[in-house]
């Protein structure tokens, strides 16, 4: 693709290795019984190693989350090791020791490879079934393998994106090439237990922009609050949610904070849309927008209430324009409401005006895969948007058999 001067490009064919200064790899370590790729490494070659992260708000945190939160108090990372096929959550002190051993093994392998690295510079992420210990013999052998398989080109990033998948159908990655000649790349996984507080997600973002840890943290927190925290598929919140942002500084370009914020936001927003599109059992991609609320917080609460309502979600699965279920859902939200002021539209077609059904409401066509629900509460200026999906037979089937 030809680069045009003054343009910023967003490319889904690229990921964490699009920015200069990063290598990555994905290998099959044997953690998954299927033999699929299940161990990924993202390595920062520098010259800078600034980093930031945001994590699950679930009080039950997996061992890798506890480890990586400690590591990030330094504001510095050289590497991120990620496994799928096991969450290493609710595994007690032994599970934390496994995480520590993984970081030590990565540090030793990188040092042997030629880059002196300490365990305190290695973030660890895991995803999969909660409650089981990881097969450490396979994982540690895989660490040595993945270090030697690292690529600086796009292939390594693609392999890493595949290796972190669990019930995902497709890998999620994207890169933004800024017109000032610096780049932000990213990869993510997540298909079930998607809810605010990130989204059962592992996400690694990389940039070759020169930025301090505080600048990265500001950009990341703002982006996560506007994107991942507003993706709500099933109301469940994972023990393992982790989003990391690493800077190599290899471009030697220090962007303005506003430019960095915008670039990270655009990458996170695109990854969020990919997560929504590949959610478990999804047949409809749904956007719930609430306007006219007393406050933005009220709008967000109302939008979440609608997005999580099982009757709304099953109606959408059946392409049924059942606006009454939307009103019933929003009526349960603990916010300021006047039922006689509420209006609802589906895909721009009015189905309820001031609390009463609109002519032709039952004939609105919701057969397309994308559905926009807009609810105007009519009591203020607050507004918010939530991404969600329908609730299908496939979702129930997949989650009823996940551990077996």
From Swiss-Prot:
Localisation: Cytoplasm
Disulfide partners: none
Site (Involved in the stabilization of negative charge on the oxyanion by the formation of the oxyanion hole): 127-128
Reactions catalysed according to its record: N(2)-acetyl-L-ornithine + L-glutamate = N-acetyl-L-glutamate + L-ornithine; L-glutamate + acetyl-CoA = N-acetyl-L-glutamate + CoA + H(+)
The protein's annotated pathway: Amino-acid biosynthesis; L-arginine biosynthesis; L-ornithine and N-acetyl-L-glutamate from L-glutamate and N(2)-acetyl-L-ornithine (cyclic): step 1/1; Amino-acid biosynthesis; L-arginine biosynthesis; N(2)-acetyl-L-ornithine from L-glutamate: step 1/4
Biological process terms in GO annotation: L-arginine biosynthetic process; ornithine biosynthetic process
Keyword Amino-acid biosynthesis: yes
Gene Ontology MF terms in the entry: glutamate N-acetyltransferase activity; L-glutamate N-acetyltransferase activity
UniProt entry tagged with the keyword Amino-acid biosynthesis: yes
GO cellular component: cytoplasm
Enzyme Commission (EC) number: 2.3.1.35, 2.3.1.1
Binding site for substrate: 166, 189, 200, 280, 399, 404
InterPro entries: Arg_biosynth_ArgJ, ArgJ-like_dom_sf, ArgJ_beta_C
Main location per the UniProt record: cytoplasm
Annotated site location: Cleavage: 199-200
Catalytic residues (positions): 200 (nucleophile)
Domain of life the protein comes from: Bacteria
Keywords: Acyltransferase, Amino-acid biosynthesis, Arginine biosynthesis, Autocatalytic cleavage, Cytoplasm, Multifunctional enzyme, Transferase
Note: Was identified as a high-confidence drug target.
Family: Belongs to the ArgJ family.
HAMAP family, sorted: ArgJ
Function: Catalyzes two activities which are involved in the cyclic version of arginine biosynthesis: the synthesis of N-acetylglutamate from glutamate and acetyl-CoA as the acetyl donor, and of ornithine by transacetylation between N(2)-acetylornithine and glutamate.
Oligomeric form and interacting partners: Heterotetramer of two alpha and two beta chains.
The protein's name: Arginine biosynthesis bifunctional protein ArgJ
Organism (species): Mycobacterium tuberculosis (strain ATCC 25618 / H37Rv)
């Amino acid at each position: 693709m030809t680069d045009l001067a003054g343009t910023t490009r967003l490319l889904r064919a690229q990921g964490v290795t699009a920015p200069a200064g990063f290598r990555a790899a994905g290998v099959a370590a044997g953690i998954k019984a299927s033999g699929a790729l299940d161990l990924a490494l993202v390595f920062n070659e520098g010259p800078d190693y600034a980093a930031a992260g945001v994590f699950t708000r679930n009080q039950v945190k997996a061992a890798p989350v506890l480890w990586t939160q400690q590591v990030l108090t330094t504001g510095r990372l050289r590497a991120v090791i990620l496994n799928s096929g096991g969450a290493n959550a609710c595994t007690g002190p032994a599970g934390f020791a496994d995480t520590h051993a993984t970081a030590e093994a990565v540090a030793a392998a990188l040092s042997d490879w030629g880059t002196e690295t300490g365990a305190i510079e290695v973030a660890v992420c895991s995803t999969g079934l909660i409650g089981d210990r990881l097969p450490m013999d396979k994982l540690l052998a895989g660490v040595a393998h993945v270090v030697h398989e690292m690529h600086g080109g796009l292939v390594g990033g693609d392999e890493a994106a595949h290796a972190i998948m669990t019930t995902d159908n497709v890998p999620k990655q994207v890169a933004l090439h800024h017109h000032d000649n610096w780049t932000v790349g990213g990869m993510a996984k997540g298909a079930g237990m998607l809810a605010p507080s990130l989204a059962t997600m592992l996400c690694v973002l990389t940039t070759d922009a020169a930025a301090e840890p505080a600048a990265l943290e500001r950009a990341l927190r703002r982006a996560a609050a506007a994107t991942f925290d507003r993706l709500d598929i099933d109301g469940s919140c994972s023990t393992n949610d982790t989003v990391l942002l690493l800077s190599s500084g290899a471009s030697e370009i220090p962007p303005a904070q506003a430019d960095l914020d915008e670039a990270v936001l655009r990458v996170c927003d695109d990854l969020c849309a990919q997560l929504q599109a590949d959610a478990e059992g999804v047949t409809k991609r749904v956007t719930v927008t609430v306007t006219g609320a007393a406050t933005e917080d009220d709008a967000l609460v109302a939008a979440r209430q609608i997005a999580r309502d099982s009757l709304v979600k099953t109606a959408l699965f059946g392409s049924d324009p059942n606006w009454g279920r939307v009103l019933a859902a929003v009526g349960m939200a603990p916010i300021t409401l006047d039922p006689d002021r509420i209006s609802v539209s589906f895909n721009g077609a009015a189905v309820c005006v001031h609390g009463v059904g609109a002519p032709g409401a039952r004939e609105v066509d919701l057969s397309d895969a994308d559905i926009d629900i807009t609810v105007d509460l009519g009591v203020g200026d607050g507004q918010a948007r939530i991404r969600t999906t329908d609730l299908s037979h496939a979702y129930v089937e997949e989650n009823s058999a996940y551990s077996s």
